[in-house]
Amino acid sequence: MTFISKTQHADVVLIGGGIMSATLGAFLKQLEPNWTISLFERLDQPGLESSDPWNNAGTGHAALCELNYSPAAKDGSVSPAKALLINEQFQLSRQFWSHLVDGNLIGSPKGFINTVPHMSFVIGDDHTRFLKTRYEALKPHTLFRSMEYSEDHGQIAKWAPLIVKGRNAQQKVAATRAAEGTDVDFGALTRELTTYLGNNGVEINYGHDVTGISKASDGGWDLTLKHPRSGEHGRIHAKFVFVGAGGGALHLLQASGIPESKGYGGFPVSGQFFRCTDETIAAQHSAKVYGQASVGAPPMSVPHLDTRYVNGKRSLLFGPYAGFSTNFLKNGSYLDLPLSIRPGNIIPMLAVAKDNMDLTAYLIKEVAKRHGDKVEALREYYPEAKDGDWELITAGQRVQIIKKDPQKGGILQFGTEVIAGRDGSIGALLGASPGASTAVPIMIELLQKTFPKNFKGWQGKLKDMMPGYGVKLDENPELAAELERATAKSLQLESVSASN
């Protein structure tokens, strides 16, 4: 019996079976149904790394509650620009998922997306002033028109009882709430997308490592494959390659040798969460409650107490507690970081180490935290939390981008970045948050960079799939409201009224 893929040629090879590759594959099947596509995933199922529901927080990132997307300037003002951009991006994701559901291309949306109000919650006078300023900056905008603000313990308790019960009634607190927020199981969505691909002619290969990549004489790429369990080896030629292997993308991008990959490095940050599966406790909390990050903390370390829906069951999640591991993947190797160091990226990496002492100090402090300290951090958001109701789980790895900078030598960049070869034959995605929630606009950006000639001809189809494509919804309130209603109906999102 042969385990290794025997396919010799493909128009497109997708490396990695996470939400990014699955999304790109779904786009290509819609835009170019006759193209041959092969997907290779090193694990035995799709979406088991960063896309897995317990490896990420599952927040449908729309900047409704994440304070790091709209930080205070030195003068105390808050710019809404980044929050607006992220919200616009998430609206595109909602529209694409709705298109797939409406066309019966994927299964019930209840399996991957549910309504969960998004809240920001802060403690103390300074943080309260900031939150009110943020609310006043966002509220006038179409995409944030439903946002509510309160400093009243009683009102906040109606929104999220667990964060108020047992709290000192004199403590200064403030919260905002957006009732239309969502919780997304990106693992379930990834499985739906890969099932759709497999049912429509895409060759899906699990348990396959892509061990090498080299430029072919015809402008395409030759990839070497290994099936670790059987020890078999294989090869495949592709006209186009997408490296969507999460934390594993950097190594393959470096192996490609394209000039655009030079100077990039990765900084891995691991994380842990507390999880509560007690249904009586979970039933008392229906919100994703985001707070303020500690000084020096990376953006993905903002503390939050979340309602989660995984496999139809409701549970609670709190964290993350950051840590450090040299792995680039949860199922990776401790050698991932040292083996990623190249002559072209060592200077940017050293510059980042020098300029980010706050982050280093934060990670050392987090790694040294005892279990009791972690429980106390939970009680800042859930005062009556009992240690025995929560289990500590390890989340997925987040590899932040290190890149060259003409002034500093190198910078640590939070977020995601599309890297594309000049000839359009290869594309890759590096980075993390907001990540999965913006998979749709990120893959559209990749398509534009790697298929510029085809992209012009795809405009009509993209508009059919996503009626808000190419439109700033924040500047078109009627269309924004119409699409919000339509996507909520398609995705079977329950309406949660304000002030409840």
Curated annotation (Swiss-Prot):
It catalyses: (S)-malate + a quinone = a quinol + oxaloacetate. One of its GO terms (biological process) is tricarboxylic acid cycle. One of its GO terms (molecular function) is L-malate dehydrogenase (quinone) activity. The keyword Oxidoreductase applies. Gene3D superfamilies: D-Amino Acid Oxidase, subunit A, domain 2, FAD/NAD(P)-binding domain. The keyword Transcription does not apply. Pathway: Carbohydrate metabolism; tricarboxylic acid cycle; oxaloacetate from (S)-malate (quinone route): step 1/1. Pfam families: Mqo (PF06039). Keywords: FAD, Flavoprotein, Oxidoreductase, Tricarboxylic acid cycle. Its cofactor is FAD. Its EC number is 1.1.5.4. NCBIfam families: mal_quin_oxido, PRK05257.1-1, PRK05257.1-4, PRK05257.2-1, PRK05257.2-5, PRK05257.3-1, PRK05257.3-2, PRK13339.1. Belongs to the MQO family. This is Probable malate:quinone oxidoreductase. It comes from Pseudarthrobacter chlorophenolicus (strain ATCC 700700 / DSM 12829 / CIP 107037 / JCM 12360 / KCTC 9906 / NCIMB 13794 / A6) (Arthrobacter chlorophenolicus). The lineage of its organism: Bacteria, Bacillati, Actinomycetota, Actinomycetes, Micrococcales.
